Curated annotation (Swiss-Prot):
Its EC number is 3.5.4.16. The keyword Ribosomal protein does not apply. Belongs to the GTP cyclohydrolase IV family. It is an enzyme of class 3 (hydrolase). It comes from Oleidesulfovibrio alaskensis (strain ATCC BAA-1058 / DSM 17464 / G20) (Desulfovibrio alaskensis). This is GTP cyclohydrolase FolE2. The keyword Hydrolase applies. Converts GTP to 7,8-dihydroneopterin triphosphate. GO terms for biological process: tetrahydrofolate biosynthetic process.
Amino acid sequence: MEDVQNSPSQVPLAIDTVGVKSLHLPLIVSDRANGHQHTVAVVDIGVELPARFKGTHMSRFVEALAHWDEHLNYRTIKSLLEDVKTRLQARKAHVHFRFPYFIAKKAPATGSPGLVSYNCCLTGELADGRPAMMLDVEVPVMTVCPCSKAISDEGAHSQRALVRISLRMKEFCWLEEFIELAERSASSPVYTLLKREDEKFVTEDAFAHPTFVEDVVRAAAQQLEAHPSVSWFRVEVESIESIHNHSAFARIEKHK
């Protein structure tokens, strides 16, 4: 049968990445409290394509994922990238896992349990030698505006904000470390289940710790800079303003 993909390209330009996108896959992620947890990832996977080839072999990406160990860690991602490179005879391979990570969280006053989900992403790239890995985690938090509190006779405006952390690590770290780091930086964490006693606690605690978006990004960056296992980070905080029809944001990026 004719192999059209291996025929010469009519436009001799190399393609940085070509592959399959938005493929859903069961995933097992390391969990600090329980050892591991099952979740579902949306996977993008691809390779570099030389200028001389017309196309890549899309089915081989799916075959590689079908044979892959579902545990997400450095060893298994390295193995997957090596397998993809071999199957596609490629110089460089790239994979991107997006998945929700769940943490059981007790309400601060009543202890009522609830699951909070966090959007996470792990990206791996392999060219020659050791693969490069990057972790992304998005953490919802609450902020209370210090200016609004200072100038108002009663109350202050508050809102949900998103702390987005991207980082490269020298060694294994728990996802919980960076989630807790983000929550410590804001006026308050957010919760799934709150009874009246909990709402009172969260409101009063948040108003006792007002934070600008600038305060949150600096507090998070300070902790990431001090983390011994982080070699590079970027942290962005987006405040979904409750009294404006726009968001506020702040970002810090640093190589260590």
